[in-house]
Amino acid sequence: MRSKLGTHFKKASVISGSVTQSKVNQSTFSRSIIGTSSRKSLNLHAESKMGERNLSMVSKQSIKIFDDDGKDVSPQPLFQAEPGTVPQKQNKLFTPPDASGIGASDIFSSISLQHTAFNASFVGPFTRSTFGASTVSRSSKETESMTEDIEETGFKREIASLSEIQGKQHEMQPTEEDLDKIINIFLTDTETLWLLDMPPALTATDSENADLVRVRNQAYEDLCKDKVGNDKYIERMMQTFSGAPKNKEVQCDRIILEDTGVMASVWDLYDSYLSPESLPMKEAVDRAIETKNISSSRLSESRGTQSMNSLGRGDSFSSSIADIERLALTRIPDEVEPDSEEILKSEKFLQDLFFMERVVVENTFQSRLAAYRQLPVIADPDEDEDKISAMPSNIVSPSLNRLWSFACDVTKGHNVSSMSWNKKNSDLLAVGYGQFGFAEQKGGMACCWSLKNIMWPERIFHCECGVTAVDFSAVHPNLLAVGMYNGTVAIYNVQNNEDFPVLDSSDNPNKHTSPVWQLKWIEHDRGNLGDDKGEILVSVCADGRITRWHIRKGLDCNDLMKLKRTGSGKSKKSSNEKERKGEAFISRQAPGMCFDFLPKDSNIYLAGTEEGHIHKCSCSYNEQFLDTYRGHKGPVYKIVWSPFCPDVFLSCSADWCIHLWQQDVLLPILTFSNTTNAVYDIMWSPSSALMFGAVSENRVEIWDLGVSIIDPVIVNEANPGVKLTSILFAKNTDCVLIGDSD
């Protein structure tokens, strides 16, 4: 029986400056211990990419590698010896030039150190114990054949000496030139790695939703448990069909593109650049003086410590400061005291005053303006709380509370004759000022008031005589028609602040010769007047004519109707027959006092006369009246069609009465009389079909036919010595405007 002990060891050497790593591979050493003859075999195999020769044994040398900065970057050994083991010695085995000096003790010591590795890599498959404790179960022939195969593989390679390897190591060390070479490193994109990230939704245990989250989590866990082995839940595959897209054609407005350009010259850029840098004279001079003081202090310090060269630099610095000061003084103009008259007359100052005045007025009258517009009132912090608490909280009966008065020093003492709202801007009010009596005539005016400034009118148009009627155009809201006591009809443009009309009838041969008591813009859209479609101006005058005005090169007119006097129907003869005949001949035409067109048919209108009659007329026929409504005993001052019921109208007269008429009935349906004074003006409410307002000489009456047809629901007495003249309801609010003689 022959036993063999095989030992396998492996060593690695690192060569500086070379990318190739040499490996001293497996060597097998077999020796028989029992028997007369012994056999020694040691194979050393070396594998290299460069085709290096085999080595018997290479002594392990510690080689250090340093980088360009002098740092030690030598690789650390992969094998860590167990504590207590003896360091391995370098052996030179069976190499012709280096074979001297090798003893048997060196060989056996190296064999014993690598015995563990040998058992693990080579003998491991053939034994169960370590350090040769077990015998090989294979036959000696199989073992010898395996050893011969290993030896044949090793002898096929050439054997290289250790001195040659050391020489190669020395030759492959980098030189200074190699270290100074520039190495190009190319960076390329690597493949993108997608990592699934599903952030969890965490909820604090002490939050408000913690209980709800716990319940949902528990329900989900129960559902997952119930699904396993439950017949209620089955897996089923489905396919979702998405609808096929459809192409549709649509139309849109043409997209209009416009190109705009602005040219800026060099001087514009220069001025714009310097404008924020312009400073007042005092600030610039202070900066120049401060700079000069700093320069003088620096110059004094430099003279005490530096040479003549430094003095020269200080002199140049001070001279440059002087140049800067002269430049600042030349660039900054002399301060000129502004002229107060120029400031007061400047447009910018007037515009600033205009806006500032509006802001102050709106802040002062905020509560009243809010009540007018039916908005919540902001409490004044400076107002006494006792006064607020003393105000009644609930008002049982309806009443009128005064908000403010459109009055100023210019309008003080003038009689309000007419009022009209602008058709487009409901905040703009036109008021005419003039006297009604012939002996009381004086200069009149027409003013345009705005709710944004109730203390002063926006426009003031002075007239030679008193203004008796005003009205805004609906088609052209900037045109204001004004009728005067001397029969003149004028048209003003409220967009301009000029105090003269753009058109008037003073040069027209067919102008009115008596006071124009009413005028109104009428829209004719039914084509009954031929070429005169659109908006026309109609006026009624005390000379007995109802006239239509056209705006062409000037104001041209033609008569719609001449109001003729009508008898009472009874002819009585008396001794004064000649006197009555003469009177009838002189006053053949009845003075016109008012008119109003039918809302549903602009070709039909009513005209009130000084006789007390109301005539129904047509624009297509001017020879005679269509109908005559008799009921008043005095001059008819106002006629108003109902905005809700087109066949009903109201009329007021100097006979203290207000009549309610129906178009098909020639006698009044209702008569309202609650005063002993003449009723000057009436108007329907724009918000209620049964409510209207009336103004007599000393009181304002608000009637509600749904409450009472005998007495008005609201009565407000005028101040002593003040006569009320006109009434006008405000639009979109529960307010009414009253004109008086003050």
From Swiss-Prot:
Main location: cytoplasm
Pfam family, one: WD40
Record's keyword terms, sorted: Cell projection, Cilium, Cytoplasm, Cytoskeleton, Flagellum, Repeat, WD repeat
InterPro entries tied to this protein: Dynein_IC, WD40/YVTN_repeat-like_dom_sf, WD40_repeat_dom_sf, WD40_rpt
Subcellular location(s) per record: Cytoplasm, Cytoskeleton, Flagellum axoneme; Cytoplasm, Cytoskeleton, Cilium axoneme; Dynein axonemal particle
Protein origin, superkingdom: Eukaryota
Biological processes, Gene Ontology terms: cilium movement
GO molecular function, one term: dynein light chain binding
SUPFAM superfamilies linked: WD40 repeat-like (SSF50978)
Cellular component per GO, a single term: dynein axonemal particle
WD repeats: 462-502, 511-559, 631-671, 674-713
Oligomeric form and interacting partners: Part of the multisubunit axonemal dynein complex formed at least of two heavy chains and a number of intermediate and light chains. Associated with axonemal dynein subunits such as, DNAH2, DNAI3, and DYNLT1.
Function: Plays a critical role in the assembly of axonemal dynein complex, thereby playing a role in ciliary motility.
Protein name: Dynein axonemal intermediate chain 4
Organism field: Xenopus laevis (African clawed frog)
Lineage of producing organism: Eukaryota, Metazoa, Chordata, Craniata, Vertebrata
Gene name as annotated: dnai4
